[in-house]
Amino acid sequence: MAVDYSLYLVTDRILVGPKDFLLSIRKALEGGVTLLQLREKETNSREFYDIGVKVKELAAEFGVPLIINDRVDLALALDADGVHVGQQDLPLAKVRNIIGPDKILGYSVSSLEEALQGERMGADYLGAGPVFPTGSKKDAAEAIGLAKLKEIKAGVSLPVVGIGGIGAANLRVVKETGIDGVSVISAILSQEDPCAAAKGLVDLWRN
């Protein structure tokens, strides 16, 4: 499947509140989000699944692929388009064996060494970061900066998405590293109008 990585939204139900969660995602999709990741760190498996069913319907309505964060089992149960795993999750090669060759497999990296490992082990794309300090992830590592992001992109043949602290104010300089897209949370979901926020980011990326 051809994937547009340019504006990759990672969800945060705690940030927007359960009541406004689906509406915020709909507005973000209306604004031009090209890839969606469902990330649920604070819920049990059943609740995650129930939320996932609704989010998958929304993503399908807009023709946007749905990626599940970490939970390979739920990605399969939901028949999502793919799964994104990090350094502390199941080994990448094992995840690829489980999900098969056709699902999208994303991998979080913070160095060229990790990126090369991801490429060898069967990742379809890399999420590199955090590029800048971020408040959206409590467990975020130290920021890697633009130079290292550029190094990662230059060192692999896979699509690379910049993650962490990216928003309207710095998107242009991030794009100049040559990466294929940006992953955001608060730059869309913390804004008063997620649709307008997404449109603004799309315009910055394309122009």
Curated annotation (Swiss-Prot):
List the molecular function annotations (GO) for this entry: magnesium ion binding; thiamine-phosphate diphosphorylase activity
Q: Which domain of life is it from?
A: Bacteria
Q: Which cofactor does it need?
A: Mg(2+)
Co-factor binding details: Binds 1 Mg(2+) ion per subunit.
Query: A single GO BP annotation from the record?
Result: thiamine diphosphate biosynthetic process
Q: Which Gene3D superfamilies match?
A: Aldolase class I
Q: Specify the pathway.
A: Cofactor biosynthesis; thiamine diphosphate biosynthesis; thiamine phosphate from 4-amino-2-methyl-5-diphosphomethylpyrimidine and 4-methyl-5-(2-phosphoethyl)-thiazole: step 1/1
Q: What does this protein do?
A: Condenses 4-methyl-5-(beta-hydroxyethyl)thiazole monophosphate (THZ-P) and 2-methyl-4-amino-5-hydroxymethyl pyrimidine pyrophosphate (HMP-PP) to form thiamine monophosphate (TMP).
For this entry, the protein name equals: Thiamine-phosphate synthase
Q: Say which species the protein is native to.
A: Desulfitobacterium hafniense (strain DSM 10664 / DCB-2)
* Gene that specifies this protein: thiE
